């Protein structure tokens, strides 16, 4: 198995990206194609052991799509951009998955154009794993579609359910619709329409959940449009960051608190690990005809290593084939 890694994408590229690739090659024994400028990548590989270096190959790409560039315009003008070349490697079968911490819009567009949509899927969705009291749970869409139709949410639910079962190992995953109340009569036109479709679909649909339910792990797959999902995701990131700052501030102001923190250090480290997005790697772009993993733009080595692990799991569990097999037959009769 080979995974194409966009070495030039992200706030900390190429240094942290290549470092994450080296760690993945050493610890996970992955074969990785580093896509980008050889003159920028090659010097960084001196840190790799001989075994890891043998699993890392460079594929030249002379251009980079910046975060603030228009994805459509950039893809037309920059045919040799690292994300374009990495996607092409998957399309041609030279790699089995794609990972990037670069422009999300560019990766979505490149994946759609290069890999195509799975038959029966109208729009792809970005799915992310959220830490909850019951372990990691899947939220989608978190940014691919700021607007959606009930039919799209139904398709997201099917894809999310398959991914949760195949890749996350959750048997008969509970699917819920994110809403402003638990009652089926609440919500806007989108949510009300989706509720009726989900209720009739061959899914383990448990109804609506509210925002306060998400982190208690009440559902395994939570479905919403990309606007709402992105707000939830960014709110969660901000809340975790604020809580960490609050704890540090309180510790500075109290010697007793500092003593307590020493005693509670193992528990605090465990909590920090559970809340660290880097532990979960990247978010799969579900609905495209290939494994495409989107990483946070500020990803460092640990996040990249874990994103490569997620990509490997996706390929090994063959969730793309599962979606291809189940989606058309399940979705069409309902709509």
Curated annotation (Swiss-Prot):
EC assignment: 2.3.1.274
Pfam families: FA_synthesis
GO cellular component terms, semicolon-separated: cytoplasm
Positions in coiled-coil regions: none
Catalytically driven reaction(s): a fatty acyl-[ACP] + phosphate = an acyl phosphate + holo-[ACP]
Gene Ontology terms describing biological process: fatty acid biosynthetic process; phospholipid biosynthetic process
InterPro entries for this protein: FA_synthesis (IPR003664), Phospholipid_synth_PlsX-like (IPR012281)
Top-level taxon: Bacteria
Keyword Transferase tagged: yes
Pathway(s) it belongs to: Lipid metabolism; phospholipid metabolism
Top-level EC class: transferase
GO molecular function, one term: phosphate:acyl-[acyl carrier protein] acyltransferase activity
Keywords: Cytoplasm, Lipid biosynthesis, Lipid metabolism, Phospholipid biosynthesis, Phospholipid metabolism, Transferase
Subcellular location field: Cytoplasm
Subunit architecture: Homodimer. Probably interacts with PlsY.
Function: Catalyzes the reversible formation of acyl-phosphate (acyl-PO(4)) from acyl-[acyl-carrier-protein] (acyl-ACP). This enzyme utilizes acyl-ACP as fatty acyl donor, but not acyl-CoA.
UniProt record similarity statement: Belongs to the PlsX family.
NCBIfam families attached to this UniProt entry: plsX (TIGR00182)
HAMAP family: PlsX (MF_00019)
Record protein name field: Phosphate acyltransferase
Provenance organism: Heliobacterium modesticaldum (strain ATCC 51547 / Ice1)
Gene name of the encoded protein: plsX
């Amino acid at each position: 198995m080979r995974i194409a890694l966009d070495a030039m994408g992200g706030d900390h590229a190429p240094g942290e990206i290549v470092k994450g690739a080296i760690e993945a090659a050493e610890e996970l024994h992955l074969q990785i194609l580093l896509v980008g400028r050889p003159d920028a990548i090659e010097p960084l590989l001196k840190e790799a052991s001989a075994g890891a270096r043998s699993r890392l190959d460079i594929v030249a790409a002379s251009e980079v799509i910046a975060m603030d560039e228009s994805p459509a315009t950039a893809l037309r003008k920059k045919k040799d951009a690292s994300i374009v070349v990495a996607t092409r490697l998957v399309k041609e079968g030279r790699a089995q998955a794609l990972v990037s911490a670069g422009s999300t819009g560019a990766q979505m567009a490149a994946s759609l154009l290069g890999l195509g949509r799975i038959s029966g899927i109208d729009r792809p969705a970005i799915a992310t794993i959220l830490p909850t009291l019951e372990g990691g749970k899947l939220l989608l869409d978190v940014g691919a579609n700021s607007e959606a139709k009930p039919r799209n949410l139904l398709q997201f639910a099917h894809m999310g359910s398959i991914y949760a079962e195949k890749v996350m190992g959750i048997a008969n995953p509970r699917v819920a619709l994110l809403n402003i109340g638990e009652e089926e009569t609440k919500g806007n036109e989108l949510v009300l329409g989706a509720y009726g479709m989900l209720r009739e679909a061959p899914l383990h649909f448990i109804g609506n959940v509210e925002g306060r339910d998400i982190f208690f792990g009440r559902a395994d797959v939570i479905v919403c449009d990309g606007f709402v999902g992105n707000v939830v995701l960014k709110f969660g990131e901000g809340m975790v960051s604020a809580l960490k700052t609050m704890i540090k501030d309180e510790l500075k102001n109290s010697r007793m608190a500092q003593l307590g923190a020493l005693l509670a250090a193992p528990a605090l480290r465990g909590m920090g690990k559970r809340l660290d997005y880097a532990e979960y790697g990247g978010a799969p772009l579900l609905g495209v005809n290939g494994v495409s993993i989107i990483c946070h733009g500020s990803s460092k080595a640990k996040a990249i290593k874990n994103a490569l692990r997620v990509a490997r799991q996706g390929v090994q569990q063959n969730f793309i084939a599962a979606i291809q097999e189940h989606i058309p037959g399940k979705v069409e009769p309902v709509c």
